């Protein structure tokens, strides 16, 4: 049980996908201008990353390895992610049309989010079992969502702040992301992985 807790804390804080592994930067910068949109994207990405990581592990373990088709891993995982994203898009459209409109083009773009493919490939490379794969996918998504929501809250405050003209827009956003990354580096000694 301790191993699973360490995996969760380590993935969310110490090895954060956005701030440490630099995966998922496109939605991190693109959807983080409003807190509501960032929260919605975080929830959708959490659902997709968790489900895609489980499905990828199952396909790898039950189909690709037994049939010696390991060279098709990346292609198979991309197809799995596309199916999961389409399912998520249908669910969001039915349950929350407002959120569906807010997310706009970014919802289908979860398919091309490198963090989703990264979590599936890292699960296999790290040799995780089924439970570890599910937890790793969920933890990576929670870390992604946490950072995106924090970043969106900071960007909303910066939008009304008196920022010098050369630093407005993406410049201050990148500086803020760098400072957040430095803050998360403080968790490095927390968990030994």
UniProtKB/Swiss-Prot annotation:
Biological role: Part of a membrane-bound complex that couples electron transfer with translocation of ions across the membrane. Required to maintain the reduced state of SoxR.
Record keywords, A-Z: Cell inner membrane, Cell membrane, Electron transport, Membrane, Translocase, Transmembrane, Transmembrane helix, Transport
EC category name: translocase
Membrane-related topology note: Multi-pass membrane protein
PANTHER family: INTEGRAL MEMBRANE PROTEIN OF SOXR-REDUCING COMPLEX, ION-TRANSLOCATING OXIDOREDUCTASE COMPLEX SUBUNIT A
Pfam family, one: Rnf-Nqr
Enzyme Commission numbers on file: 7.-.-.-
Protein name: Ion-translocating oxidoreductase complex subunit A
UniProt GO cellular component terms: plasma membrane
Localization annotation: Cell inner membrane
Oligomeric and partner information: The complex is composed of six subunits: RsxA, RsxB, RsxC, RsxD, RsxE and RsxG.
Higher taxonomy: Bacteria, Pseudomonadati, Pseudomonadota, Gammaproteobacteria, Enterobacterales
Keyword check for Electron transport: yes
Keyword Translocase assigned: yes
Native organism: Shigella sonnei (strain Ss046)
UniProt record, GO biological process: electron transport chain
């Amino acid at each position: 049980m301790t191993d699973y807790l360490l995996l969760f804390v380590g993935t969310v804080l110490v090895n954060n996908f956005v701030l440490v592994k630099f995966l998922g930067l496109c939605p991190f910068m693109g959807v983080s201008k409003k807190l509501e949109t960032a929260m919605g994207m975080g929830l959708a990405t959490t659902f997709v990353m968790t489900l895609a990581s489980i499905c990828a592990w199952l396909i790898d373990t039950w189909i690709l390895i037994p049939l010696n088709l390991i060279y098709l891993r990346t292609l198979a995982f991309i197809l799995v992610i596309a199916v999961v994203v389409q399912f998520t898009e249908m669910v969001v459209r039915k349950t929350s049309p407002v959120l569906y409109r807010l997310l706009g083009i970014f919802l289908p773009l979860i398919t091309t989010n490198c963090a989703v493919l990264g979590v599936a490939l890292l699960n296999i490379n790290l040799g995780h079992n089924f439970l570890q794969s599910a937890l790793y996918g969920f933890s990576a998504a929670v870390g992604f969502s946490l950072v995106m929501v924090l970043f969106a809250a900071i960007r909303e405050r910066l939008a009304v702040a008196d920022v010098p003209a050369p630093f407005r827009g993406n410049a201050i956003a990148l500086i803020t992301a760098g400072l957040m990354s430095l803050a998360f580096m403080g968790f490095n000694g927390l968990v030994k992985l």
